Regions:
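Short Lys/Arg-rich cationic patches that frequently serve as NLS/NoLS or arginine-rich RNA/DNA-binding motifs
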Residues: 1-14, 41-45
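A general secondary-structure signal for short beta-strands and their flanking turns/coil
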Residues: 14-16, 63
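Short acidic-hydrophobic surface loop/beta-edge motif
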Residues: 16-26
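Short, surface-exposed, charged amphipathic helix/loop patches that serve as local interaction elements
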Residues: 32-119
Length: 119
């Protein structure tokens, strides 16, 4: 089968809906609106991990949600995309940025995933 025949038979992949959240400084966080059942299960187990301190579980759960839900993060007009780049940027974020991200993730979970507990 040639390239063109393969391209004709190509079906567009389904994409999860995305939501944009902006802070007062104009920074934007774009989050996915869907999570697989396995991702939901993993999140719950991380959030309630009895072998870790509550604060450790809470921070790990927030990072887990960040990894799974964030599609793009624009900070001072500099876009960051891709899981590795986003996670690296998150790990060097200021306390204020992390607080905003945590609050945004909480609002997003409440709106799109009411069955999940917020970190």
């Amino acid at each position: 089968m040639g390239k063109r025949a393969r391209a004709r038979g190509k079906v567009d992949k389904l994409r999860a809906p995305e939501s944009e959240y902006a802070d007062p400084d104009g920074n934007v966080l774009v989050l996915r609106g869907a999570m697989s059942p396995l991702t939901r299960h993993r999140y719950k187990s991380i959030l309630h991990d009895q072998s870790k301190l509550t604060d450790d579980s809470w921070q790990r759960a927030t990072e887990f949600l960040f990894e799974r839900l964030v599609v793009r993060w624009v900070v001072f007009d500099v876009p960051t995309e891709g899981q590795k780049e986003l996670l690296a940027r998150y790990r060097i974020a200021s306390q204020e940025e992390r607080r905003w991200i945590r609050d945004t993730l909480r609002a997003h979970l409440t709106e799109h995933f009411p069955d999940l507990e917020t970190p």
